[in-house]
Amino acid sequence: MPKTLTEKLNAIKATGKGIFVPYIMAGDHEKGLDGLAETIHFLEDLGVSAIEVGIPFSDPVADGPVIEEAGLRSLAHGTSTQALVETLKTIETEIPLVIMTYFNPLFQYGVENFVKDLADTAVKGLIIPDLPHEHANFVEPFLADTDIALIPLVSLTTGIERQKELIEGAEGFVYAVAINGVTGKSGNYRADLDKHLAQLHQVADIPVLTGFGVSSQADLERFNAVSDGVIVGSKIVKALHQGEPIQDFIRQAVAYQK
């Protein structure tokens, strides 16, 4: 039976709408983790498909400056993995949450304990950007009997045979990385990006979402046209931190009709 994240995103895809997943940094709020539910419900009320929730880490190798600084602010507020898990247990939401964490915080907490402690929460997906596919067995056995999907990341340099290997048996969605580099860098897309995304669609039987560098209305239109939806991080994080209006951008993303 498919996991909840797979079912919910496939249901959105079936309507012809683009899937929209904003990223937020847990604890990057004037109230620290006490403000997490407020942010989640703000985004839920705007109709987002799912929410990616980042765990702060001191050495975020895949993150650009906006998200790295958000992580430092969160750590300064006292955010810990344990405290986040306890906070997530108290949050009620109808949309799936996807945790983005580097492997170190997960390892320190204990993978088995982490998964068990999230069992009764809204967390339905897990992204670990620094965990090689060859080491997925460090995590996958603990997810097998849960409703949490391990999300595969596929880069632009991934050949088709490797794509098949990464995607085989995956649930939730495929995270297609739009740029070679860190999050937040926009506009420097490779000429063969659309071809790469089309190829991903041929081998994936779950939604393909494009992320890294997606930040403008033009990006929304481009990537919704060649994938099933988008993930937006740095733009959302920056707007929430600086108190900038972001509602119209999110509404446009949520309403996108293919």
Swiss-Prot record:
Entry GO terms, CC: cytosol
Family annotation (HAMAP family): Trp_synth_alpha
Alphabetized CDD domains for the sequence: Tryptophan_synthase_alpha
Species for this entry: Streptococcus pneumoniae serotype 19F (strain G54)
Catalysed reactions, as listed in the record: (1S,2R)-1-C-(indol-3-yl)glycerol 3-phosphate + L-serine = D-glyceraldehyde 3-phosphate + L-tryptophan + H2O
Record protein name field: Tryptophan synthase alpha chain
PANTHER family: TRYPTOPHAN SYNTHASE ALPHA CHAIN, CHLOROPLASTIC (PTHR43406:SF1), TRYPTOPHAN SYNTHASE, ALPHA CHAIN (PTHR43406)
UniProt keyword terms in alphabetical order: Amino-acid biosynthesis, Aromatic amino acid biosynthesis, Lyase, Tryptophan biosynthesis
Gene of this entry: trpA
EC supergroup of this enzyme: lyase
NCBIfam families: trpA
Record GO terms (molecular function): tryptophan synthase activity
Membrane-crossing segments per the record: none
Record-stated family: Belongs to the TrpA family.
Protein purpose: The alpha subunit is responsible for the aldol cleavage of indoleglycerol phosphate to indole and glyceraldehyde 3-phosphate.
Pfam families the record matches: Trp_syntA
Catalytic residues, chain numbering: 52, 63
EC number: 4.2.1.20
